[in-house]
A protein has these predicted regions:
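Loop-helix junctions at membrane interfaces
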Residues: 1-165
Length: 165
């Protein structure tokens, strides 16, 4: 199978997994709905398909989750920045830990800071930023760690192709 076709197919499967898992596991925290599975899928995308297909996955997943009522507009900056940084870090260092760290930094820190202008536009009290910040940190950490342990298990059993991404 052509590499682009493989990546597109895998991205579609990961989008479907994300939508299904987001229906099952959701943690409402203030004005956001936290989905650790989004971060889990983001790390898998960073490793298996790279930053650009991962970015498409995050965008499409966020749109679909909003349409189905299982997401919020805060999903866009967090998931998209997180997977992009995770994919770039994985491509540079080829270590699963860097993909997980990239997701955590991209979503937990940078993505949460990017919600400030959205909060202003949506007329949400900026005093609620800190709970949102901590929710982003905690959920991106949880999802990233789940993906890290799964990928390390696959790597130990020689089921992870090192040429991914």
């Amino acid at each position: 199978m052509n590499n682009n076709t493989r990546k597109l197919t895998l991205t579609s499967i990961l989008i479907a997994m994300n939508i299904v898992l987001s229906q099952i596991i959701s943690i409402p925290i203030g004005p956001i709905k936290a989905f650790p599975m989004q971060h889990f899928i983001n790390v898998l995308c960073a490793v298996f398909v790279g930053p650009w297909y991962g970015l498409a996955q995050a965008l499409i997943s966020s749109v679909l989750r909003n349409i189905f009522g299982t997401g919020s507009f805060f999903a866009f900056p967090g998931s998209m920045i997180g997977v992009l940084i995770a994919g770039i870090m994985y491509n540079k260092f080829r270590k699963i830990g860097f993909a997980s760290l990239g997701e955590w930094i991209g979503t937990g820190i940078i993505g949460s800071i990017c919600t400030i202008p959205m909060m202003f536009v949506m007329n949400i009290d900026l005093n609620s930023f800190m709970p949102i910040f901590y929710a982003f940190l905690i959920n991106s950490f949880m999802g990233s760690m789940i993906a890290y342990f799964l990928l390390k298990l696959l790597e130990r059993r020689n089921l992870l192709n090192k040429r991914n991404g």
